[in-house]
């Protein structure tokens, strides 16, 4: 969960004489910065961003794939919180495992805080039987965090007569940045058409504090637990002969933040519909997530919208998320069956 920023409305508030809103706005911004340091960006389309959810999904698709994800959180406040993700992975027959690459860019408070996370992943696949296999993965990479003061606005910089922003910062501020290594581990397993796994991100709990004395810069270990299944119903009276229902559960914990997500997917031929409920156990708001997806042999598209169920709905207007997956090459028989049956989104 991220706290929203009012800084886009600051100019109008000062023109109306609401100087007190600045103190609240600046407090919210500082709290948001602390939250960013303590928690990773989140995506609602968990399985449309599988390597982000769990690195052990690397190389578990039938074909090499490239996935692009975009999330605009709380769009009514402008493009205040935006996250972009790119991942590429493939199965390698010679190693009986998968290799992958992931690059994530997260922009907070319209560019005041920026984070880039890049990593390489290797996943080893183990074929236990015709009905059961599992994967274990190690992810190594870096995190780059930047603090950009050019996005900050203070009341002394705003002309209360015409709202023009000018002047200098009333307190000394310096831009800063930090680059540190990062490591994660994950494992997934599949038995028939049920799947489950766990992931541990930020094993070393890296210190992202940009300034000396900042005690809130430590990035806590993130635990992810997930499970799901697919059931098939064959019929002759709808679009295709096969209708799929897939219930899923995802639990995540990072520091004091705890969240549980439960949802179900309905798939009919090229169409996928999904509905999830998100419950933030340690903080609010909760939300309802509606999803729509299209799928063909070489392309998948997903769109989702988070409906906030809390008092912040009037200010945030939910969150938009888009995913696109591209598959490459031709299918070749593998050394063993290790394609995951996870949902499209």
Residue ranges of each PLM-predicted region?
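Bacterial Sec-dependent N-terminal signal peptides
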Residues: 1-42, 264, 292, 326-332, ...
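Subset of outer-membrane beta-barrel
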Residues: 39-345
């Amino acid at each position: 969960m991220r706290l929203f920023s009012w800084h886009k409305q600051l100019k109008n508030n000062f023109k109306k004489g609401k100087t007190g809103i600045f103190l609240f706005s600046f407090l919210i911004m500082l709290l948001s910065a602390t939250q960013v340091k303590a928690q990773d960006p989140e995506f609602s389309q968990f399985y449309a961003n599988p390597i982000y959810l769990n690195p052990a999904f690397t190389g578990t698709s039938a074909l090499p794939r490239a996935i692009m994800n975009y999330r605009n959180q709380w769009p009514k406040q402008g493009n205040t919180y935006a996250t972009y993700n790119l991942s590429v992975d493939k199965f390698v027959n010679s190693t009986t495992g998968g290799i992958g690459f992931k690059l994530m860019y997260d922009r907070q408070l319209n560019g005041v805080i920026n984070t880039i996370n890049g990593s390489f992943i290797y996943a080893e696949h183990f074929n236990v039987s015709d009905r059961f296999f599992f994967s274990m993965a190690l992810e190594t990479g870096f995190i780059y965090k930047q603090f950009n003061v050019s996005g900050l606005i203070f009341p002394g910089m705003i002309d209360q007569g015409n709202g023009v922003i000018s002047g200098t910062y009333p307190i000394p501020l310096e831009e800063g940045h930090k680059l540190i290594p990062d490591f994660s581990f994950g494992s997934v397993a599949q038995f028939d058409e049920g799947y489950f796994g766990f992931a541990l991100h930020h094993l070393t709990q890296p210190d992202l504090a940009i300034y000396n004395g900042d005690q809130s810069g430590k990035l806590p270990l993130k635990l992810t637990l997930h499970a799901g299944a697919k059931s098939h119903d064959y019929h002759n009276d709808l679009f295709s002969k096969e209708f799929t229902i897939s219930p899923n559960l995802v639990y995540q914990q990072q520091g004091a933040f705890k969240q549980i997500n439960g949802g179900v997917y309905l798939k009919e031929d090229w169409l996928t519909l999904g509905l999830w409920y998100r419950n933030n156990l340690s903080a609010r708001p909760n939300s309802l997530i509606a999803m729509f997806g299209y799928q063909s042999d070489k392309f998948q598209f997903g769109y989702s919208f988070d409906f906030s169920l809390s008092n912040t709905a009037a200010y945030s207007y939910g969150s938009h998320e888009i995913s696109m997956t591209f598959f490459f090459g031709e299918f070749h028989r593998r050394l063993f069956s290790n394609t995951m049956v996870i949902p499209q989104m």
